[in-house]
């Protein structure tokens, strides 16, 4: 696995080749979309640095990089709700990663199955309004993540 800053492979090699050459951003991160392998539901969007991607590939469990905590984290390390990776894909220019996983428990730190539990609607005046959908909690986050 190489960083695009270290080398500049030809576009055709990136788009059509078989070498994994993730294109990390200036902060050393790549966006990762994680979906449920069975249902296809989007569970979360997070970021990976080179180490998180490598650990995910090697271990078969999802690892991410937290921008707010500035550290690597294994999904489920606190909650026990790990993600077993069934498939990893990269997009055409290798600047985004897609994980298809078997999710144990909830994916969201709020206790919900998915981090995408609010839909943008409009109120009577046309202003944006968030509507809760699929918002049932599978666990109480206060019991798992004490403050």
From Swiss-Prot:
Pathway: Amino-acid biosynthesis; L-histidine biosynthesis; L-histidine from 5-phospho-alpha-D-ribose 1-diphosphate: step 3/9
A Pfam family the protein falls into: PRA-CH
KW Hydrolase (keyword) present: yes
Cofactor(s) essential for the protein: Mg(2+); Zn(2+)
Entry's localization field: Cytoplasm
Note on how the cofactor is bound: Binds 1 Mg(2+) ion per subunit. Binds 1 zinc ion per subunit.
Chain's role: Catalyzes the hydrolysis of the adenine ring of phosphoribosyl-AMP.
Family note: Belongs to the PRA-CH family.
Swiss-Prot/TrEMBL catalytic activity: 1-(5-phospho-beta-D-ribosyl)-5'-AMP + H2O = 1-(5-phospho-beta-D-ribosyl)-5-[(5-phospho-beta-D-ribosylamino)methylideneamino]imidazole-4-carboxamide
EC assignment: 3.5.4.19
UniProt: Zn(2+) binding residues: 92, 108, 115
Keywords: Amino-acid biosynthesis, Cytoplasm, Histidine biosynthesis, Hydrolase, Magnesium, Metal-binding, Zinc
This protein's name: Phosphoribosyl-AMP cyclohydrolase
InterPro entries: PRA-CH (IPR026660), PRib_AMP_CycHydrolase_dom (IPR002496), PRib_AMP_CycHydrolase_sf (IPR038019)
Annotated residues for binding of Mg(2+): 91, 93, 95
GO molecular function terms listed in the Swiss-Prot or TrEMBL record: magnesium ion binding; phosphoribosyl-AMP cyclohydrolase activity; zinc ion binding
Native species: Rhodopseudomonas palustris (strain BisB5)
Gene Ontology biological process terms from the UniProt entry: L-histidine biosynthetic process
């Amino acid at each position: 696995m190489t960083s695009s800053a270290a080398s500049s492979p030809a576009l055709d090699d990136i788009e059509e080749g078989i070498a994994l050459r993730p294109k990390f951003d200036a902060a050393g991160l790549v966006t990762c979309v994680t979906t449920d392998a069975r249902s296809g539901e989007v569970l979360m969007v997070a970021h990976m640095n080179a180490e998180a991607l490598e650990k995910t590939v090697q271990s078969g469990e999802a690892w991410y990089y937290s921008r707010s905590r500035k550290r690597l984290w294994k999904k489920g390390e606190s909650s026990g709700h790990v993600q077993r990776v069934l498939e990893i894909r990269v997009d055409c220019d290798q600047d985004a990663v897609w994980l298809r996983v078997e999710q144990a428990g909830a994916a969201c730190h709020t206790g919900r199955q998915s981090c995408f539990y609010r839909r943008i609607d409009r109120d009577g005046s046309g202003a944006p309004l968030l509507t809760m959908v699929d918002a049932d909690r599978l666990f109480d986050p206060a019991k798992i993540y004490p403050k």
